Amino acid sequence: GREKFLQEVEKFVTISKDTIHRQIKKMGSSCDWSREAYTLDKERSAAVKAMFEKMKNDDLIYRGDRVVNWCPHCLSTLADDEVEYREQAAKLYTFKYSADFPFAIATTRPETKLGDTAVAVNPKDLRYKKYVGKEFDVDFAGVSLHLKIIADRGVDIKFGTGALGVTPAHSFVDYEMAVKNKLPIIKVIGEDGKITDKAKKYAGMTVLEAREKIIGELKKRGLLQKEEDIKHNLSVCYRCGTAVEPIPSKQWFVAVDKKITIPGNKYFKNKSLKEVALEVVKKGEIKIIPEKFEKI
């Protein structure tokens, strides 16, 4: 549980503390060690808990889904800087979702297409302009999908067919598109790295098994148009080297744009956290060193 975890953290801190001190001194730092602070010490922890509770009471804290880096082997999330990238050979598949879908898409991960809820095209791409806003029901390799054609300036016209299958649950970029366009989010890869029940006949398969089955199905239906060899950067866990899966997870969020009024507070009078943060920096009530970072 939580308490046991925190005890292990404290053990690690005790072991590492002297090493960190020596490293800092070797770098030439002359610090006032009497003012040393630790993120999880009593004073800092109390301040964080008090502020979290206050923000929760002011309706500034809410819980929602967010796509995270997930290691199916370690069963844990990874920060962006804990993800390593390894160049490897990969296949780029070009295919149509179904015979009655009007155009093809290209992807290196056909198994994630089981969770597609839209297809994005660049608004400047005249090939697809007439399809934007339309919706299609397709039978993709034996799984029913409802796809909406959306326009997004981030789509690279020159990559693949210029049409991007949007998988909100398993791509950071696609998740942002889904939020912006109010698209459904369907999780087809679970924490164990296997296909979920949402993908019907492929449930329980590994991603590689599902990929092979889907490509076989597309070939059988005459929908696979092209299979190209490319170089691809694979995201892997820095600890074990397992391929990282982007999956949605429950996270805590701060509503930085929500306007609130706090009685007796001179700042929060129908203003958001973002607005107040900018105001106090501009007035010089909070100093940011060096000053050049005030513009960020």
Briefly describe each language-model feature range:
Residues 1-103, 159-296:
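Residue patterns forming the tRNA-binding/recognition surfaces of aminoacyl-tRNA synthetases
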Residues 99, 103-166, 170-176:
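Protease-associated
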